[in-house]
Amino acid sequence: MSQSAEQFNPDFQPTGIEGGVDTNLLPWIAIEAVDGMSIKTMRASGETGAFSVIIKLDSGTTMPAAVYLSGMDMLLLSGRIRYTQGEQVSLLNPGTWGYISANSKVAGIHAETESELLVNFYGAVAFLDRQHAVSTILTSLDIMRKALEHGVALVPSTLAGC
């Protein structure tokens, strides 16, 4: 460690997770609210509510309608997704990046084949039931809890968390 780094933060002991993680080593964690959906937890902030995960949807899985309370962006890593919003239907293939703005309601995300997405949630997402009432809310605190339960070290939001 450099002399300036030691003077800035003498307690800093690099662990190797400061800026990245090998997601191949992370376990898939089931999301009880959505049958056929599991995640790999990577990062979650208790301060901002943001969290980053890799989502796996089994073939044929449809995520319930949801309201993205703070927006999100996603990159389809593998598979094929059908995204429905009102009367519009989009087919997403690997390499497709998308953004959903805050307070947007999405009618459905359906995996035509087993699919994996890298998703950055800027805050909580509210999953809706068939009557379009909130059935469950997924937050950064849920991600932190799941990571702790499965022994996953999350990438810190700041170097102070290292």
Where do the PLM segments sit?
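Short glycine/proline-enriched turns and hinge-like loops at secondary-structure junctions
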Residues: 49-50, 67-69, 110-113
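Residue-level recognition of well-ordered beta-strand positions that form the cores
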Residues: 54-56, 80-82, 120
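Conserved hydrophobic/aromatic beta-strand scaffold that supports enzyme active sites
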Residues: 39-41, 52-56, 73, 97-99
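A short, N-terminal "cap"/entry segment at the start of jelly-roll beta-barrel domains
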Residues: 1-49, 133-138, 142-162
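A cross-kingdom feature marking solvent-exposed beta-strand/loop segments within repeated
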Residues: 55-57, 61-66, 89-92, 103-105
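Short acidic-glycine-tyrosine-enriched beta hairpin
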Residues: 46, 73, 82-106, 110-111
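A short hydrophobic beta-strand segment most commonly corresponding to one strand
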Residues: 99, 112-129
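Glycine- and acidic-residue-biased ligand/ion/polar-headgroup-sensing regions
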Residues: 59-60, 65-87
